[in-house]
Design a protein with these regions (language model features):
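An exposed, glycine/acidic-rich loop-and-rim segment of catalytic or binding clefts
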Residues: 1-173
């Protein structure tokens, strides 16, 4: 892509237990910039356990489906009456093994973008994840139009974290 980009990311831990992430970038030519992060969470307190028992809410009536290579098709589809519907909180496990639903079958779980209803309004929660074991809740707020949710579908125990703990399939969301 053309141009030189200077990018900055600021991580701020707040007094009210929030992580505030701010991205900025400047360029000397028109170019494409797509800044993101890949944070995954297991709120149970035990990273050796799958996070599929976590309760997930996504403030989105639509999602963007992917093809068999995990590339978005460009379509925007309603979540209504599909396993992609998290407008009512439910466990990640509830529909994650739905092999009759192509979007989940192809990705071996969730690895999709939801089109948020928040319209950039930072006062509205975009997503909420809660561990029923620990009671810890993570709320996500964003001014972006979408949110990607990945359920660790291809973690296979070869990645080691703190204290040598291995991350198995679906160890985080």
């Amino acid at each position: 892509f053309p141009g030189n980009v200077t990018a900055k990311v600021l991580f701020k831990l707040t007094d009210d237990n929030a992580i505030d992430i701010k991205y900025s970038a400047t360029t000397d030519q028109k170019t494409v910039i797509n800044m993101t992060n890949h944070s995954y969470f297991n709120l149970s307190g035990d990273p050796s356990k799958a996070a599929t028992d976590h309760i997930l809410y996504i403030n989105a009536d639509n999602y963007t489906p992917v093809d068999s290579t995990f590339m978005t098709t460009g379509d925007i589809i309603s979540v209504k009456e599909t396993p992609m519907d998290f407008t009512t909180p439910k466990s990640v496990a509830q529909d994650i093994n739905r092999t009759d639903f192509e979007q989940i079958k192809n990705g071996n779980g969730y690895d999709h973008n939801w089109v948020l209803n928040t319209k950039g309004d930072l006062s509205q929660v975009a997503a909420k994840l809660t561990s029923p074991i620990s009671g810890i809740t993570l709320e996500v707020y964003t001014n972006e139009p979408g949110i990607q949710v990945y359920t660790g579908n291809f973690l296979d125990g070869t990645v080691k974290g703190k204290k040598g703990i291995t991350y198995n399939q679906r160890a985080s969301v």
